[in-house]
Amino acid sequence: MGVQKDSRDIRWNRTTRPLALLLCGLLAFSALSCARTLPEGRKANLAELVSEEEEHFLLDPGNALRLFCDTNQTTIVNWYTESTRLQHGGRIRLTDTVLEIADVTYEDSGLYLCVVPGTGHILRNFTISVVDSLASGDDDDEDHGREDSAGDMGEDPPYSTSYRAPFWSQPQRMDKKLYAVPAGNTVKFRCPSAGNPTPGIRWLKNGREFGGEHRIGGIRLRHQHWSLVMESVVPSDRGNYTCLVENKFGSISYSYLLDVLERSPHRPILQAGLPANTTAMLGSDVQFFCKVYSDAQPHIQWLKHIEVNGSRYGPDGVPFVQVLKTADINSSEVEVLYLHNVSFEDAGEYTCLAGNSIGLSYQSAWLTVLPEEDFAKEAEGPETRYTDIIIYTSGSLALLMAAVIVVLCRMQLPPTKTHLEPATVHKLSRFPLMRQFSLESSSSGKSSTSLVRVTRLSSSCTPMLPGVLEFDLPLDSKWEFPRERLVLGKPLGEGCFGQVVRAEAYGINKDQPDKAITVAIKIVKDKGTDKELSDLISEMELMKLMGKHKNIINLLGVCTQDGPLYMIVEYASKGNLREFLRARRPPSPDYTFDMTKVPEEQLSFQDLVSCSYQVARGMAYLESKRCIHRDLAARNVLVTGENVMKIADFGLARGVHDIDYYKKTSNGRLPVKWMAPEALFDRVYTHQSDVWSFGVLTWEIFTLGGSPYPGIPVEELFKLLREGHRMDKPSNCTHELYMLMRECWHAAPSQRPTFKQLVETLDRILATVAEEYLDLSMPFEQYSPACEDTTSTCSSDDSVFTHEPDVPSLFTHHTTTSMVGT
């Protein structure tokens, strides 16, 4: 008897166990062997199978199984599995005393017996287990992540008499000791083991018992696969993880080192010198290489600079380019541009343009195409080139020495006073590369935004508004709007470095050139630093790339020439969503009617669902453009006169890696009550962290502008979030909607719904709800703090913010009538 192992390394172990399930000796045949017989013509019953010896084999799916049942009694045996006799055919091949099964599957697992025909004697039995060891720790196992009981693993196997201390059953799966992964990835540690009795497994982190109680998102201990699974790892998960496998005959251990790399909030980095200038022979093939390093998902375009009507640049100074190749980093050979059978027309400048949600980077190279004879001379004449280099270098050194001599001679002369004339300010030379590029690789990429270099204007210029910062930017004809067609109105909000002004724009709607439309204008004040100016320009550039959507604040135009920078955006007459909801709360019992105040319209349950649905649509659009908001809250959603929800401030630059989230000072505030745990504790911002904030925003909507976590101090909030506490269901919210909020607040980011899924769910709910108005008796005051969140004197008990060091905010407003992106 034996087993022939396939070349793919069948792992097996063998145990012997006596079986005494039949009563022998009750009849006169007590001297006969206690071997179990299986009468011919009767199917084997698994519960009745008896053997003196069992062999257990572990196979991977796809292996070939080959069992031998050697016997001196006969040259032919019958094979049984479960309650079925095996027949020759298909994957099964029977030859004398040999059973062969090709390409085993999970269904082939079970008990196999070889039986002597006629007598029914069971000669041998085999237990076959088909297990996919390569996927033993993956999420798509058949148990779907179900956890086993650790106690079950330590029980003695029935009828076992062969004992053994724990040992590694698959050491080849444990070669990798160091795991260095970016934040947000899933990590699996495996320690596949065996022993008799079956050993138990424990996990230690840095030498201490580890059960994941204090980890955001918890862990999964998959005992049947001897694995530890951690989803959405963060920097605080770094450390040494040790598996301790033990039974009463011994113990073994193995350690893994986990290093979680923080995501880098930088635009793509291009390797210096690539692409490189290339000289090619006519008709040959050319390759340009562009090595891109980016933590955020990058998108890459290859551009060729072309001429239109004999000019390389348009009237606005932007070069004409042709997009040759567009792809993201996962595409095949995206960093290589192939040019086949090049001609003289292919000669020119080529640019590799790479971008992510943070910004853009580009590098260019020239292709020179030569006839075969010229290319041969170029290749054969290095000595001539070296001679030219020596001549030019010598000449340059001679000129440099002459210049030094002249300077030294002038220094010997007595100084003379000269009258200094006021310097004339000239525009800086620039290279405004056309951005035929979008944050999403599938977009049309028609934006012609320029890569700009900023310079301040002379102080002799007179700004249209006093105290407003001025500068020089290249003209972008697609977005430029004439200043003389703007009539500035009253300020809508003002902060330390910026202000928002209401204005009337004549002709900004090209279909109605003489009609005035109310808009909002963002301006940087004169005392703003270069960083505030740069932030506003970055916001403007990003809004150009984002395109237009009904549920976001859209860019309408810019004024960049002959004066301060104006960023013209849509105007929302009803202010931010938080104040919009609070103004429409039902009156309290002690309410006194005010004849001078016009009552606001009453909101129905359908209206509130519509608010959430519209915000989800806007966020789904931003997600499709790979834009992470990072500060989604009701205060950053604006409401138009037609009750259309518009997300604001998605273009603001936020340096999340430079913030101490635990330090409180008197200056600067952070919206901790809207932040996902991974963003709050580990500074990891993703679309999933925006989904968490959307859940809090939905809670705000159904409490009509309530303050999240009412009555809970910020310091206590940190502890409650780590322990898994969540806000209760609002009074006017259905169970289905509350469960949707709870899904948004799942501790594991990967388990939260996407904005696309949220849109689909809310669309379905919106289609089924009736216009039922809210119960006027519900006490909405329970969701309001004793003092307003926006006042600096409010205690930390109900403040929605925690403080950070003094980092100026571009648009930090006081009270406003209507705010746009502030």
Swiss-Prot record:
Principal subcellular localization: membrane
Residues in the Cytoplasmic compartment per record: 410-822
Reactions catalysed according to its record: L-tyrosyl-[protein] + ATP = O-phospho-L-tyrosyl-[protein] + ADP + H(+)
Name under which the protein is recorded: Fibroblast growth factor receptor 4
Domain of life: Eukaryota
Enzyme class, broadest EC rank: transferase
Protein's GO biological process: positive regulation of cell population proliferation; positive regulation of ERK1 and ERK2 cascade; regulation of bile acid biosynthetic process
Enzyme Commission code(s) on record: 2.7.10.1
Modulation of this protein's activity: Present in an inactive conformation in the absence of bound ligand. Ligand binding leads to dimerization and activation by autophosphorylation on tyrosine residues.
Domain Ig-like C2-type stretches: 39-129, 157-259, 268-368
Species per Swiss-Prot/TrEMBL record: Pleurodeles waltl
Keywords: ATP-binding, Cell membrane, Disulfide bond, Endoplasmic reticulum, Endosome, Glycoprotein, Immunoglobulin domain, Kinase, Membrane, Nucleotide-binding, Phosphoprotein, Receptor, Repeat, Signal, Transferase, Transmembrane, Transmembrane helix, Tyrosine-protein kinase, Ubl conjugation
One CC-aspect GO term: receptor complex
Role description: Tyrosine-protein kinase that acts as a cell-surface receptor for fibroblast growth factors and plays a role in the regulation of cell proliferation, differentiation and migration, and in regulation of lipid metabolism, bile acid biosynthesis, glucose uptake, vitamin D metabolism and phosphate homeostasis. Required for normal down-regulation of the expression of CYP7A1, the rate-limiting enzyme in bile acid synthesis, in response to FGF19. Phosphorylates PLCG1 and FRS2. Ligand binding leads to the activation of several signaling cascades.
Keyword Transmembrane among record annotations: yes
Phosphotyrosine: modified positions: Y661, Y662, Y773
Annotated region (Disordered), positions in chain: 136-166
Membrane-spanning segments: 389-409
The gene coding this protein: FGFR4
Binding site for ATP: L492, G493, E494, G495, C496, F497, G498, Q499, V500, K522
Membrane topology: Single-pass type I membrane protein
